[in-house]
């Protein structure tokens, strides 16, 4: 298969093409495909035009009824949720551990450990640089079925350097499972399923289902959660981490996630862009932060309902168990979450 190009229909002042150099290099992929989909399968080149479409549609604009519009911003203040963070903090250790860089590296295995060992050697040799926090953006080589997905937006991957991951990860990685347990204690039941195997998840779901006489399950799906994570949402999330670690370096590393600078070096040119907010794929706290924000938001809605409920979370996908007769109490969730910048679909 040969890679495809993209038609760019949007622009943004924070995206700048630094220059187009060289010739377009067509990506090639080899795959075994069934006859009925062969002519409809395609994937995108790692080119400037594809990157421009991906950046505009995945960072700055969302598709509305009348075309593309800016991504919604929060209309409610996240300070309204601070009391929940305070309650959550009580369920955390007084001072969560901070790993050494060596302990962080040793927590990985295989090729990832080798990559972090090389990054640690770099840090010891030249120290941490601001450029380590820049996003190094490329297009995911993902196959699409053109029959079921008409003109899909390319997916972008936005990692920072392994050196940055080590610097911030010594704080975040040992904290992650402690936060998940604290969320369970806040809710008074097992909520965060992210670390559970399939058997444990099934056991939890079956247990909650059996608690209700006429059970109903409502799935909550956040539309492009990472894109809708505003600067305000990140500040709220980061404030929780900073309650436990007041290290100025840690605060500075988190700030780099809120005021982001990215570069996309494509085969036919390069792009520089800036964006406030938005979750970057590959950040050490992507899973942790998404769980934290979604759990706090949903807890804020559920805590005062005059009915029995159970909540489960697996990142930005989550669900609620209630009695069928109480389903109407959940109808306000989309409006509630949208006030904090998140577009939700109820299933």
Predicted regions and their residues:
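Viral RNA-dependent RNA polymerase
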Residues: 1-347
């Amino acid at each position: 298969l040969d890679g495809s190009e993209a038609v760019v229909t949007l622009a943004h002042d924070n995206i700048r093409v630094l220059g187009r150099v060289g010739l377009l290099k067509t990506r090639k992929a080899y795959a075994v495909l069934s006859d009925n989909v062969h002519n409809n399968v395609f994937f995108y080149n790692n080119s400037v035009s594809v990157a421009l479409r991906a950046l505009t549609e995945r960072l700055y604009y969302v598709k509305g009824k009348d075309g593309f519009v800016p991504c919604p911003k929060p209309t409610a203040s996240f300070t309204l949720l601070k009391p929940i963070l305070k309650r959550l903090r009580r369920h955390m250790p007084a001072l969560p551990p901070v790993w050494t860089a060596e302990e962080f590296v040793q927590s990985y295995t295989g090729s990832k450990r080798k990559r972090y060992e090389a990054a640690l050697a770099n840090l010891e040799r030249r120290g941490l640089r601001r450029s380590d926090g820049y996003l190094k953006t490329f297009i995911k080589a993902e196959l699409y079925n053109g029959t079921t997905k008409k003109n899909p937006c390319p997916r972008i991957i936005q990692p920072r350097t392994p050196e940055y991951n080590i610097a911030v990860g010594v704080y975040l990685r040992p904290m992650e499972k402690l936060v998940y347990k604290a969320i369970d204690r806040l809710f008074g039941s097992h909520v965060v399923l992210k670390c559970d195997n399939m058997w444990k998840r099934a056991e939890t779901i079956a247990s909650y289902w059996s608690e209700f006489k006429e059970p109903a399950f409502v799935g909550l799906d956040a539309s492009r959660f990472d894109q809708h994570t505003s600067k305000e949402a990140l500040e709220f999330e980061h404030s929780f981490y900073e309650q436990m670690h007041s290290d100025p370096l840690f605060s500075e590393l988190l700030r780099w996630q809120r005021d982001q600078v990215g570069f996309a070096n494509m085969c036919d040119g390069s792009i520089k862009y800036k964006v406030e907010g938005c979750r970057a794929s590959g950040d050490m706290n992507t899973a942790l932060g998404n769980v934290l924000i979604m759990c706090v938001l949903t807890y804020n809605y559920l805590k005062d309902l005059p009915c029995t409920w159970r909540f489960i979370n697996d990142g930005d996908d989550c669900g609620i168990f209630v009695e069928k007769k109480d389903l109407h109490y959940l109808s306000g969730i989309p409006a509630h979450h949208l006030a904090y910048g998140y577009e939700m679909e109820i299933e």
